[in-house]
């Protein structure tokens, strides 16, 4: 099944599969997915919004027919399919503790119908009991584990007893919240020991070290902390299951804030380093990975990747490592003599083989030098590449390595960004901004006494998209949530951190329902 791809936010949409921005699923989509190297798809389906009343909880025949059609299309294209129960987990299954008998009866009825419908399908169809299970109104994890074990056991028995191909079909069981903390893994391991079924796999989800994955608390880079979080997570999963011969499916992986409609939250090169490392380490730990894609990676209308270079990095990671660098950005000042610029190469077991600018191979010694892991771009080369030094990207280089995909390096001319005065209400404040070639990394917010300001009160570095945004080339926007969290009448100093290393300070004050901002 490795590697896998999620048909995300499609058969959870209301009222139909196109309601959340994706087109109707076609055979061509699965042909594209298969041609790109994927061997399996995960098919998230929400059933409860297409069910009748108790006690039968009959699934709408038209809905069942639609799901059957999509399963068959994927199977026809020689893909493995993992079919699940998806948003039902928080729409009604989460009430198992407070409405036990009703929820369990509905769960039984739902899986009884699904199992009967697909009992004779190819063994390449696998079934997953529930997505991201959680329970409301419980006394804590001990009760949560007991409830999940009950659900998984009911699911297992219904499917196995339904006969046909279901007697030995691969079944996939999640941890609580599909989380990989040790207690979650241990609880599921106990369940598996009780089931004594060799055709059961486990699943967890992984979206990276949370502060990096959403850009909060200053974690703008895929650094040692983020890397250690990934390796520790995959090690725990490996030791709990794959080392004991139990398959593991990382049923969803991506970055929480990655979206083609919201560029800049996670810097592009840092994204690439994350996906490169994740793919390699999952392979080393023998984990099956399924990319969560609700349309942010593959444009399902054009059937083209929204960022072909990013997907090339993901695809390469399934089989080999790639070289990267400390950054994919080299910033040059708008005026004045240019000096040589250094980057640190992350060879990842590869050999550095040179630099290219378009079809031209740069000359070692004249255009760049390499000393150990230090790559130095000479002042003369940068001067030629920068040309008239217009703001923004002046040239794009490719660092080539002995294997994997090239590393892109943008040569960027910049000057200190300029933020202008602004006024408005607490619903949001648009701060006119001349970025002048630079790119925003994060925003720090403090009151005059040094204490943190903003909804994330535990850190001065606020969360992109929750406290601020910068999706256009002419403004930084402070959100209503950020402004509403500010103390009335207390000045806040914002420090905007840019990828060039430049910092720009700005003052903002809320007075009742009004907000004013001015350069510091």
Protein language model features and the residues they cover:
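Acidic/histidine-rich helix-loop elements
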Residues: 7-25, 54-59, 98-99, 211-227
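An active-site-proximal structural segment forming one wall of the substrate-binding cleft
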Residues: 21-40, 55-85, 93-129, 147-163
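Catalytic domains of carbohydrate-active enzymes, especially glycoside hydrolases
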Residues: 24-46, 237-241, 281, 288
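Active-site region of glycoside hydrolase catalytic domains
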Residues: 105-219, 236-256, 285
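Catalytic-core region of carbohydrate-active enzymes that cleave or remodel glycosidic bonds
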Residues: 157, 225-288
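Aromatic-rich peripheral "rim/lid" segments of glycoside hydrolase catalytic domains that contact
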Residues: 261-360, 366, 372-376, 388-408, ...
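Edge beta-strands of extracellular beta-sandwich domains
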Residues: 403-416, 501-519
């Amino acid at each position: 099944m490795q590697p896998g791809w999620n048909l995300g936010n499609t058969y959870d949409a209301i009222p139909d599969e196109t309601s959340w921005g994706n087109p109707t699923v076609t055979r061509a989509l699965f042909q594209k997915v298969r041609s790109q190297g994927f061997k399996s798809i995960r098919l998230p389906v929400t059933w409860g919004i297409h069910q009748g009343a108790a006690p039968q909880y009959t699934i709408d025949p038209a809905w069942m027919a639609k799901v059957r059609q999509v399963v068959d299309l994927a199977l026809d294209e020689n893909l493995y399919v993992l079919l699940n129960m998806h948003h039902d987990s928080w729409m009604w299954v989460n009430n198992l503790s407070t409405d036990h008998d009703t929820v369990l009866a509905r769960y039984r009825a739902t899986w009884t119908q699904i199992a009967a419908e697909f009992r004779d399908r190819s063994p390449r169809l696998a079934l997953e009991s529930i997505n991201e299970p959680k329970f409301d109104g419980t006394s804590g994890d001990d009760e949560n584990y007991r409830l999940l074990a009950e659900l998984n056991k009911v699911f297992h028995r219904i499917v196995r007893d339904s006969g046909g191909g279901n007697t030995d079909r691969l079944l996939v069981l999640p941890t609580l919240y599909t989380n990989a903390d040790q207690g979650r893994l241990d609880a599921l391991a106990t369940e598996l020991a009780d089931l004594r079924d060799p055709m059961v796999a486990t699943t967890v989800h992984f979206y990276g070290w949370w502060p990096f994955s959403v850009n909060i608390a200053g974690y703008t880079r895929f650094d040692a902390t983020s890397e250690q979080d990934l390796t520790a997570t995959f090690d725990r999963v490996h030791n709990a299951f794959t080392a004991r011969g139990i398959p593991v499916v990382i049923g969803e992986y991506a970055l929480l804030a990655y979206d083609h409609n919201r560029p800049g939250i996670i810097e592009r090169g840092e994204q690439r380093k994350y996906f490169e490392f994740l793919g390699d380490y999952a392979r080393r730990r023998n984990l099956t990975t399924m990319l969560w894609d609700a349309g942010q990676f593959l444009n399902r209308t054009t059937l083209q990747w929204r960022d072909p270079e990013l997907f090339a990095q993901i695809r390469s990671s399934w089989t080999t490592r790639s070289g990267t660098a400390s950054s994919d950005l080299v910033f040059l000042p708008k005026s004045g003599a240019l000096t040589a610029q250094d980057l640190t190469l992350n060879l990842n077991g590869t050999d550095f083989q040179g630099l290219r600018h378009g079809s031209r191979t740069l000359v070692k010694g004249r255009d760049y030098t390499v000393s150990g892991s230090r790559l130095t771009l000479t002042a003369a080369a940068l001067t030629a590449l920068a040309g008239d030094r217009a703001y923004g990207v002046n040239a794009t280089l490719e660092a080539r390595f002995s294997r994997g995909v090239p590393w892109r390096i943008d040569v960027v001319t910049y000057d200190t960004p300029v933020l202008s005065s602004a006024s408005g209400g607490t619903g949001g404040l648009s701060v006119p901004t001349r970025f002048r070639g630079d790119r925003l990394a994060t925003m720090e917010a403090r009151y005059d006494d040094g204490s943190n300001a903003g909804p994330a009160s535990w850190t001065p570095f606020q969360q992109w998209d929750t406290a601020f945004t910068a999706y256009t080339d002419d403004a930084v926007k402070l959100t209503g949530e950020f402004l509403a969290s500010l103390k009335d009448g207390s000045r806040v100093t914002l420090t905007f951190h840019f990828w060039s290393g430049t910092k720009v300070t700005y003052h903002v004050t809320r007075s009742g329902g009004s907000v004013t901002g001015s350069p510091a």
